[in-house]
Amino acid sequence: RNVITVGFRMPGCLTFDEAMDRANMVPREQILRMAAGVRPDDVCNMQYTSGTTGFPKGVMLTHYNVVNDGKCIGDRMDLSTADRMMIQVPMFHCFGMVLSMTSCMTHGATLCPMPYFSAKVSLACINQERITCFNGVPTMFIAMFNHPDYKKTDFSYMRTGIMAGSGCPPELMRRAAQPDEMHMTDIVSVYGQTESAPGSTMSACGDPLDLRCNTVGYAFPHIECKIIDPETGEEVPDGVNGEFCSRGYNTMKGYYKMPEATAATV
C-alpha cells in the first residue's frame, strides 16, 4: 500500500523518517487491537524465488518463521543493544530482512539501513556511525577492500558480520577477520534458502576461525538437517554430494497459490 524510500524522495512515496513520524500518530490502543488479531502462523512476507532455474514462486513466510530465525541468527552473532549494524544488503531479500533487520530487532541492536550498496557510502557509514557489524556477499567485501577510502576507514568498533549469499573464499573471510584489516574478528557464515526463512546452519562467534572460514557451521537449535541422494531419498555418507534437506520452525508455509509445488517441497 505504501512505498518507503531511504535517503531520497520520490513522488507518491514516504521517506523512512516520514514513515516513522506517522507511526507515532497511531494510538497505542489501535496498535494493541491490531496486534491481538495477528497469529504466529500468519504470513508476514512473501519472497519470490526461482533458485537458479524455473518459474518464480512466491515463498510465504510467517511471523513464526521470520522471528525465530532472526533470533537464532542474532544469538550466533552475539548481538546486543551495544551493536550498530549497517544494513547494505537489500531489505526485499531475506539477507536484509531476516539475517540483518530481524536479528537486530530481536536483540535490541541499532539498525543503520543504506539506500543502496556503494563501497564509498558503506565505508563512510562505518566511520560516521561507529558500526560494529555488517553483512554482505563476497563481492561487496571485495569492492570495499579495493576502494580508495578503505585505508582511511576506522574499523576499530567492528567485531562481527555475515559473509554469505554465494561461495565465500576462506582467504577473503580471513582477511576481513584480521585486526589490521576490517577487524571483523568474529566473522561468520550462514547456509540456507528462501524456503527456510532463510537460515538453517550457521557458525557462531567464538567458534575457531578455521571452522568459521571453511564451513557454513551447524544446524540452528530445533532444526533438523540431512543430505540425501535425490534419486533414492536415502541419506548419503559424509563427503558425498547430495541434496540438502531441513525441517523445523523455519520451514515456509508454502508457495503462493501453488499447492502441487508446495506438496512436493514441504
Residue ranges and their predicted role:
Residues 5-11, 17, 22-48, 55, ...:
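Conserved pre-ATP/AMP-binding loop-to-beta segment of ANL
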Residues 20-21, 131-136, 145-211, 224:
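Gly/Ser/Thr-rich phosphate-binding loop
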Residues 43, 49-52, 85, 91, ...:
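Conserved S/T- and glycine-rich ATP-binding loop of Class I adenylate-forming
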Residues 57-60, 87-88, 109-116, 188:
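Short beta-strand->loop structural element characteristic of the AMP-binding/adenylate-forming
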Residues 67-84, 92-133, 143, 147-148:
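Conserved AMP-binding/adenylation subdomain of ANL enzymes
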Residues 209, 251-266:
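Conserved ANL (AMP-binding/adenylate-forming) active-site segment centered on the GW(Y/F)…HTG consensus within
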Residues 226-245:
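Conserved beta-loop-beta connector loops within the AMP-binding
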